């Protein structure tokens, strides 16, 4: 995960996980 998805995942999971984003350091990233 190197590209920020512009979404945080402090309280809820990454909604953007449907496009390959994963939670890292409270922020959603994708490869």
From Swiss-Prot:
Judging by the UniProt lineage, the source's domain of life is Eukaryota
The species this protein belongs to is: Melicytus chathamicus
Record's function text: Probably participates in a plant defense mechanism (Potential). Binds to and induces leakage in phospholipd membranes, particularly ones containing 1-palmitoyl-2-oleophosphatidylethanolamine (POPE).
Q: Which InterPro entries would you find in this protein's record?
A: Cyclotide, Cyclotide_bracelet_CS, Cyclotide_sf
Q: Which Pfam families does the entry mention? A: Cyclotide
Q: Does the keyword Disulfide bond apply?
A: yes
Domain comment, as recorded: The presence of a 'disulfide through disulfide knot' structurally defines this protein as a knottin.
For whether the record's keyword set contains Disulfide bond, the answer is yes
Listed name of the protein? Cyclotide mech-5
Please state which protein family the record places this protein in.
Belongs to the cyclotide family. Bracelet subfamily.
Alphabetically list the UniProt keywords: Disulfide bond, Knottin, Plant defense
Which post-translational modifications are recorded for this protein? This is a cyclic peptide. Contains 3 disulfide bonds.
Q: Where is this cross-link: Cyclopeptide (Gly-Asp)?
A: 1-31
Q: What is the lineage of its organism?
A: Eukaryota, Viridiplantae, Streptophyta, Embryophyta, Tracheophyta
* Covalent S-S links between cysteines: 5-21, 9-23, 14-28
The Gene Ontology biological process annotation of the record reads: defense response
């Amino acid at each position: 995960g190197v590209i920020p998805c512009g979404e945080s995942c402090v309280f809820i999971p990454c909604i953007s996980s449907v496009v390959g984003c994963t939670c890292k350091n409270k922020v959603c990233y994708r490869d």
